[in-house]
């Protein structure tokens, strides 16, 4: 039976929902329907108040051990109370008295149907729920939320659309149905910042029970929010931690999981019902230890994120609920309808808090003339920034396709504009320091960025977006620039309009936009390895299926040729990055080498032992020809001589001209083969 969420269990958004304690007099004046709403309190009360509790006698009154201290005693036999004392909150019998809560504690036994609860039980659940602070009302104060989840400070005031009573009820119905849920909403409605918090709340109250119709045993598991990048894990976990009234992780319901996590970001007292913010790769290592799985930024089609969707769909009986969150379904709606079993689609209507104006700057050059198109684009960008300039003390973001273009455009703009220029992308280590400069500067700041800033960092003083409309899509041993998809455009545009009115200036024709099938330009070994680990049937169990299946089967044959057992592969997947699949051959040789190779993958520190080991794999590349690019760079046109992509052409930059062969150490390190 589908349960609607009674308003007394809404999450306190501190706008029109507040934490509240109900009195017995209020209960007496309620309708039967309103009283029956308190029956659902039995689930959080059993989990968080009555678990391991017992009956005590305190000053001659039977109470629950969570109410008062006293000697453990055998419970009395319960009939209908002779008298109700609302002042003392006790039921009076001829020979004894018992607290409302203790009466309910004794009556709420396994397999009892909650619709059988009478007024006597409901009064006790009201008292127990008040003690847990699980109830809410449309009146109250922010300060009343202190202590709800053990927090020392009040919850934040959140006026966003995702925490309105209507949205809360809709999300709860989808969550409790155990159907896969696809949740969309405009940028600024609070998808990532609020919906995970709401699901944490539902999990705290009702998670772990197989049904909300009757009392059963429960299996408490946390929620996980799986994200494609460490920056997002840190950003969103910190946002939700603060909004729940915590200043430190320890003892809060918030935990983080990602590779090489620093000690200070480990919650040493996590909550069983809590929420874990994790990178996709670490989410997969313990996927079924979570009750509710939230996968964010679905539109990005991060490889491991798509694999999580496939695994969760294949083994949907092992999880309670799956939420896929994305700003837009422009590219994926039809596939999701087919792929997911009976999915629920939820859209949270709403827009950014402030208006966003759009400006189109036409490029008269056809994109097929790449160099001329970019030169015209840079000239247009200077003109646009001069015409549509952020106010003093504010910033604008220029979206370009690659790290190399960040430097190219910054150099071009610095010579022509009097503003502060910065670069931010995924490989920049001092982003916080850069942002401090941006926020403290009285001048105009222009930030040049890759698609990294579409979601990974929120710039609070940004008022203008200048979008070149392109993205670099990596491919095995190369990659190419492509025009963005509709969902990427929505993400970029949504960077403004959150704090102040914004302007979105775009420099590309909308007809150039197209969906990007990332799987067609990826190494496919992870799909093979995780399919083996989770018993996926290829290719039909994949969320996105490669256009060229021959590459998938060649990858499978290549992996099989390593002669590594499935059990060993599973251990490697759980413990190492394996940025190049060939590294697996080295990880299985010795623990000492594995430790050094792992350190190289994490830090880039290349020891002689690791270099010699990788060279022994003979990952050769043949140099076909080269040409001079600039003072210290030569472009080498090469051919791959190993692996699935044997025969594929690649372009490699090196500081001097080379002939003959190179050995590949990593995707960025190459060693010339000594011809002597």
UniProtKB/Swiss-Prot annotation:
Annotated GO CC locations: virion component
Stretches assigned to the Helicase ATP-binding domain: 172-347
Keyword check for Transcription: yes
Principal subcellular localisation of the protein: virion
Protein's cellular compartments: Virion
InterPro entries per the UniProt record, alphabetical: DEAD/DEAH_box_helicase_dom (IPR011545), DNA/RNA_helicase_DEAH_CS (IPR002464), Helicase_ATP-bd (IPR014001), Helicase_C-like (IPR001650), NPH-II (IPR021892), P-loop_NTPase (IPR027417)
Gene Ontology molecular function: ATP binding; helicase activity; ribonucleoside triphosphate phosphatase activity; RNA binding
EC number, as in UniProt: 3.6.4.13
Record flagged with keyword Hydrolase: yes
Binding annotation for ATP: 185-192
The reaction(s) this protein catalyses: ATP + H2O = ADP + phosphate + H(+)
Helicase C-terminal domain: residues covered: 366-535
DEXH box (motif): residue ranges: 296-299
Quaternary assembly: Monomer.
Family membership noted in the UniProt record: Belongs to the DEAD box helicase family. DEAH subfamily.
Role according to the record: NTP-dependent helicase that catalyzes unidirectional unwinding of 3'tailed duplex RNAs and plays an important role during transcription of early mRNAs, presumably by preventing R-loop formation behind the elongating RNA polymerase. Might also play a role in the export of newly synthesized mRNA chains out of the core into the cytoplasm. Required for replication and propagation of viral particles.
Protein name, per record: RNA helicase NPH-II
Species of provenance: Monkeypox virus
